Amino acid sequence: MKASTLAAALLVLAAHVGSAEAGDPIKPTGTPPEPRFNRLYDTEAVGKFLADYARAYPRWVKLTTIGKSTEGRPMWLVTVNNPETGPELTKPAMYVDANTHANEVQGTETTLYLLNFMLTRYGKLERVTELLDRAVFYFVPVVNPDGRSKWFGQPATPHFPRTVATPRDDDRDGLVDEDGYDDLDGDGVITRMRKKVPLGEGRFRLDPKDPRMLVRVKRGERGDYKLLGWEGFDNDGDGKINEDPLGYVDPNRTFGYDFQPRYVQRGASDYPLQIPETRAIATWALTKPNLAAAQSFHNAGKMILRGPGSKHVPEYPRADIAVYDLISKEGERLLPGYKAMVIGKDLYRAHATTVDHLYMVHGAISFTNELYRAPTDLDGDGHAKPEERMKFNDLLTLGRQFVKWKKVKHPQYGEIEVGGYRHDVGRVPEGWLLESECHRNAAFVLYHARQLPKLSIARTRVRAQGKGLWRIDVSIANERAIPSMTAIARQNKLHRADLALVTGAKVIASGIVRDLDLDKIDLQRHRPERLLVPGVAGFRQQRLFFLVQGEGEVTLRYESLKGGLLESRIKLVEPSTRKEFK
């Protein structure tokens, strides 16, 4: 065998072996956790899982905190990065958070599922391997640890607690949080209250087919039951019940961008980023210039949401909307029954939300998924009727969801009944439905993350210009949908443009090639060796021009805050064979 042939064969073999090693599964150095994803976990259990992942994968997983909650609980931050392919800030980043609202719990399990899936599938699934090799992931699995702890540890409803634990005088009587829900029968769940009254004094009657349910009487009919709301009594003697529970500060209405006060939007804090939970996220995000995409998990309704959340937020640039549409439309296919929607246009007005803040301040393509919709529409007419919910309870959960009515003494109402659906019904799937929801939404995040900028030096061309001058044309390609600088980032100058640096020779001129055929170039006036590039659009190329004086070779370094780093050495020669620059 000729020496040249042998050398070539060895190079091919070395490249093959290196590729195999790079794709080897991650070998844990400790015992990795094995969570089951057909159940929910309280705050302490989630923290233990995260610590176990960090111990099992110490080179890949870093567990820190981004701050403390209102009551002093840690807000965990999980960073997943392949150290063999570079430091985290040199790669595009995907941010994922969950459980912003206390009662919207299963987003945390979805985040755990995604974390577990990536770590255990690296080296086994090509798409997972490629993604973890070129991107970094940041997870905040529990944005509201105080609220999660209360939802799991105290009597709750499907809708309460929702807020952070900031005391608030909701009824403006000078006291804070003094009249919340009360577990009248001591069963650990807040259900409904109903009272039998003399015929004609009520607006409801028992359903003749199922006395567990009440039906509203029609005009001319007389009822003998009243519905009295959630379990509770008049704690403060003001004649009202449950009017001032845990202070209503909605963390997803307290971010910095498009903040509006409480007289405009219920749930607002006194000023932007007042509460430690959202302030911690906003402050941390400022330290991550590589943040290019974001995903928040909420519930419920099966929706894939993006901003703008209100008319105060300008309409997103068309180029960015195209990226949003591409990702969300694929999401509708990955998530049967989910619908892509614009918050302020298709749903409701919402100010100072996570998605608007991360997009309008950081230029990150951001979604909120509203997880799950109870599959209780058994006849497929688009409406889940009370009798269908009860049938689902009886036949599919064998009665688990509905708490039977029980007589209790009420300090204001006298003898009443308490009963109804448990706090984990309606917004949260049963365990046998949870894992499927986790997987499909994790797959959506991975698809979203797959669209993070993937830059490469597609082509270079060197031509002698005489007298030691060389013209260098470089084409930077983006193989994915998200640009290395979103349109909103360019429009509002949210962060530094991409930077192309040439060293090793004197740079006489540089610029962006606008028309290759006509050789139209937008020249940069100052410091041509540091060419500012307004990003590379998704599935496009950006063509750069340099005129240098020197000999030997130069080094081209392309630095993109959202798209990572590229570096190439370019010889100042005109080779006899070179791919034509197009």
Where are these regions (language model features)?
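Bacterial N-terminal signal peptides that target proteins for export
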Residues: 1-7
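Bacterial N-terminal signal peptides
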Residues: 7-16
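Boundary at the C-terminal end of the N-terminal hydrophobic targeting segment
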Residues: 17-22
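Short glycine- and acidic-rich boundary segments immediately preceding or forming the N-terminal edge
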Residues: 23-74
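Metallocarboxypeptidase
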Residues: 62, 74, 138-140, 146, ...
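Short helix-loop-beta-strand segments that form the rim/entrance of peptidase-like active sites
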Residues: 107-153
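Acidic carboxylate motifs that coordinate Ca2+ or other divalent cations, activating on Asp/Glu
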Residues: 169-173, 187, 234-238, 381
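C-terminal beta-sandwich/jelly-roll accessory domains of carbohydrate-active enzymes
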Residues: 477-582
